[in-house]
């Protein structure tokens, strides 16, 4: 993991804060904090900032210069708030920037059946990685990872954190330990996917190794950044992205496969005769959501494509959470 050398007037506090974070929090949380705080440090160094308290104007100027998308602003603010709380616990006077009210305008990209077929075919024919590479099995890892995300609706972090001990390949069940909500759950797999995982584990030779990651990376598991980079290569080859997209807008990504799973699972349950009020609780538990409100966020698709289904889900959630006169 890359070591950042902080240079601003808060360099010592930043260094000790990151040492605390790496010892206390998950690796991905640490990486995000490290990235955001180092950006903040560079900006403060650039403007020769040297005051004890950082006001809102300086924070806003930093966010504007970095070009943080609206949907990501509160993530950056959260890191700064945690850092300032850390300094406050050391007896220092700080300013805590408030979270900003943002509109969630993000609509996920829903891959068509033809696009999914192309993605799978391209992933299966992915060029073999150089055997001397630090990650020699990337070509096979991506083919399996993509199917796991789409077929089981896993979050990317959940899939990448899987180890052999979390898989029951005899019964076709995955045990999710590293969840967003810190809740464990069991995820059943289709027999076809289970057999693919068996073959994959044999080919990359992770059977018999002391508790290996399902998707080995350079040091631990395959990193989310590497996985997304490889997926974008596949999407470009499939003609789904062209390479000239706005860098500040979210393009199709691996997380879109979880949205695809949610929509197609909902459609299958509806086709099988399950009404929305029966199907939604099952999907909510299966996907590890804390509430049906969280599941509703995954039903944000283009209304032109799925207008009827959007109305069904909206009617259901309105009956669950009626308006209350205050």
Predicted segments — roles?
Residues 1-326:
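Conserved catalytic core of the tyrosine transesterase superfamily
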């Amino acid at each position: 993991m890359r070591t950042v050398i902080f240079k601003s007037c808060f360099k010592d506090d930043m260094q000790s804060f990151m040492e605390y974070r790496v010892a206390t929090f998950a690796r991905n949380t640490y990486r995000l904090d490290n990235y955001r705080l180092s950006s903040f440090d560079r900006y403060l160094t650039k403007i020769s900032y040297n005051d004890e308290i950082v006001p809102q104007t300086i924070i806003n100027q930093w966010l504007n210069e970095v070009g943080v998308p609206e949907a990501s602003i509160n993530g950056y603010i959260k890191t700064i708030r945690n850092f300032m709380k850390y300094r406050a616990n050391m007896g220092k006077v700080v300013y805590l920037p408030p979270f900003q009210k943002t509109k969630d305008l993000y609509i996920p990209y829903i891959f068509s059946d033809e696009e999914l077929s192309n993605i799978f075919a391209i992933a299966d024919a992915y060029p073999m990685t150089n055997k001397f590479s630090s990650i020699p099995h990337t070509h096979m890892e991506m083919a399996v990872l993509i199917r796991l995300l789409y077929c089981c609706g896993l979050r990317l972090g959940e899939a990448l954190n899987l180890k052999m001990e979390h898989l029951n390949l005899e019964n076709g069940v995955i045990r999710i330990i590293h969840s967003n909500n810190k809740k464990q759950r069991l995820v059943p797999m289709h027999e076809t996917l289970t057999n693919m995982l068996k073959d994959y584990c044999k080919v990359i030779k992770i059977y018999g190794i002391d508790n290996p990651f399902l998707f080995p990376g350079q040091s631990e598991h395959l990193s989310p950044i590497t996985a997304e980079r490889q997926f974008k290569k596949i999407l470009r080859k499939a003609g789904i992205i062209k390479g000239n997209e706005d860098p500040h807008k979210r393009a199709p990504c691996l997380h879109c496969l979880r949205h695809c799973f949610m929509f197609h699972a909902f459609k299958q349950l509806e086709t099988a005769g399950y009404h929305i009020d029966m199907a939604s609780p099952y999907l909510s538990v299966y996907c590890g959501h804390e509430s049906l409100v969280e599941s509703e966020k995954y039903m944000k698709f283009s209304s032109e494509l799925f207008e009827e289904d959007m109305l069904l889900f909206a009617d259901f959630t309105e009956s669950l959470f009626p308006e209350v006169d205050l």
